[in-house]
Design a protein with these regions (language model features):
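Nucleotide/phosphate-binding catalytic cleft detector across ATP-hydrolyzing
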Residues: 1-159, 175-189, 209-216
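Long, contiguous, structured domain-core segments that constitute the functional module of a protein
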Residues: 40, 192-197
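A mobile "lid/hinge" subdomain adjacent to the ATP/sugar-phosphate binding pocket shared
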Residues: 195-216
């Protein structure tokens, strides 16, 4: 099975022959009784993945980041659908600035891994999945255009990828990856700043309620 999985700081996105899906890159070390997210059992521990109130995967070092691997393995297990065993050919990404330093280490940490995991929407609905990650390709985030639209990278080109918690900027010269930058910015950070400003200015506890009142 060929899969592209992008474990972003905000959301985890997965694409395969079946189509695509995404969930929030959050992990809780407990099981929620009522939840629209996913429940997994991995190495004897139970987790809730994708819950609004969970902790986001924010570590720069993806190799040793527990949340990164839990989100990655959850995405693969969910993509397996009705299959219980699969051999995975994986494409994933790293923040542009850390690509050269972490690429080989990440490939080494994932390639050949045999993973057993249970996944479901409740503890009572868990299904056993087992997969082997046979091959791993790692791209710098924001470099997908190399595959989807290489003709646009003529001459000197900058590609900007605005994520939830980071902005990746990649400089290309005639399709060659030259300089990467990763800025700790993003739409979630912007949204939090706007919410803070509105709360401060209008002295409201819930921005959504205030907006709804103004609309009427």
């Amino acid at each position: 099975m060929k899969l592209g999985v992008d474990v972003g700081y905000s959301h985890t996105k997965c694409v395969g022959a079946f189509g695509e899906f995404k969930f929030k890159s959050t992990v809780l070390d407990e099981v929620q009784d009522v939840s629209s997210s996913l429940v997994i059992e991995f190495e004897g521990e139970m987790y809730t993945v994708g819950e609004d109130e969970g902790l986001y995967a924010t570590e720069i070092d993806k190799i040793n980041d527990k949340s990164f691997k839990l989100c990655l393995y959850t995405a693969i297990a969910r993509a397996m659908r009705n299959s219980n065993e699969e051999i995975i050919q994986l494409v994933t990404g790293l923040p542009a600035q850390y690509f050269k330093e972490q690429k080989d280490k990440l490939i080494k940490s994932l390639k050949g891994q045999q993973v057993s995991i249970k996944i479901g929407t409740t503890p009572d609905s868990l299904e056993f999945k087992e997969f082997i990650i046979k091959d791993v390709i790692v791209f710098p985030q924001s470099a997908g255009v190399l595959v989807t639209d290489p003709k646009s990278l003529v001459g000197d080109t900058c590609v900007v990828d605005i994520g939830g918690f980071t902005v990746d900027v990649s400089y290309f010269s005639n399709r060659k990856f030259k300089k990467p930058y990763t800025l700790e910015l993003g739409m979630n950070i912007l949204a939090a700043s706007i919410v803070g400003m509105i709360k401060s200015k209008y002295q409201v506890s819930y921005v959504y309620q205030y907006i709804m009142r103004k609309k009427h």
